[in-house]
A protein has these predicted regions:
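Short alpha-helix
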Residues: 164-181
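A short SAM/SAH-binding and catalytic strip from SAM-dependent methyltransferases
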Residues: 82-95
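Core SAM-dependent methyltransferase catalytic element
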Residues: 180-183, 198-216
Length: 216
């Protein structure tokens, strides 16, 4: 949370849209600093979990949760001061369109923040897979046998069909953001050891989280 706050400097005011909010991690960060947050997701179970967590922490009155498809939002133009997304963009079927939607609904001078990673990097080739397996062996020795979605072959096969699965990012994001009209585009790679706990930092070492930050 502290690391994210460092990177959202200048974007932490006004009306915020959290796209693909999941359990509300990013929504809560903005709510805690006094922003009005609208959080959307297309998964009702995630929204319920996020609302429950927000209520327990006393911030439910600061966040409005909505069931919406990020690729066809019905918000009017120039509505939000900041649009933010964390670990959701790679799942979109039409990511270029999503950047266009974000640009449309942002106010002039508004901020766009996109936290993501090359989540399917281990499947890009044998060399990438080798490094990923090596890290997995280290984790197993340290923490014991574990399972996550990388062990779910059916899920991985579905993810491989997504348009961004084999696209090198954030280079792609930089190109599309420029074409969309965004200005002051910045790309940063986050310090994994500060962003994740020790287990996750090693698990995702081969696919570090990056931040795309830009203004309309």
């Amino acid at each position: 949370e502290a690391l994210i706050k460092q990177h959202i400097n200048g974007c932490q005011k006004g009306k915020i849209l959290d796209v693909g909010c999941g359990t509300g991690f990013i929504s809560l960060i903005f709510a805690k600093i006094g922003c009005e947050v609208i959080a959307i997701d297309n998964n009702i179970a995630m929204l319920k979990a996020a609302a429950k967590i927000s209520e327990e922490l006393g911030f439910l009155n600061k966040i409005t949760f909505m069931l919406k498809d990020a690729e066809s939002m019905d918000f009017t133009d120039n509505t939000f001061d900041t649009v933010v997304s964390r670990h959701a963009f790679w799942l979109f079927n039409n990511p270029k369109k999503v950047y266009g939607e974000w640009y449309r609904i942002l106010k002039s001078g508004g901020c766009m923040l996109n936290l993501d990673a090359n989540w399917l990097f281990p499947f890009w080739g044998e060399e990438q897979a080798k490094h990923f397996r090596s890290d997995e062996d280290i984790l197993t020795k340290r923490y014991g046998t574990f399972r996550d979605y990388y062990h779910d072959k059916d899920m991985m096969n579905e993810f491989k069909k997504l348009p961004l699965s084999y696209i090198k990012r954030p280079e792609w994001d930089l190109k599309i953001c420029k074409e969309t009209g965004f200005k002051e585009i910045e790309i940063e790679t986050l310090a994994q050891e500060k962003y994740w706990n020790s287990f996750m930092a090693l698990r995702y070492r081969t696919m570090p989280t990056f931040l795309v930050k830009a203004k309309k």
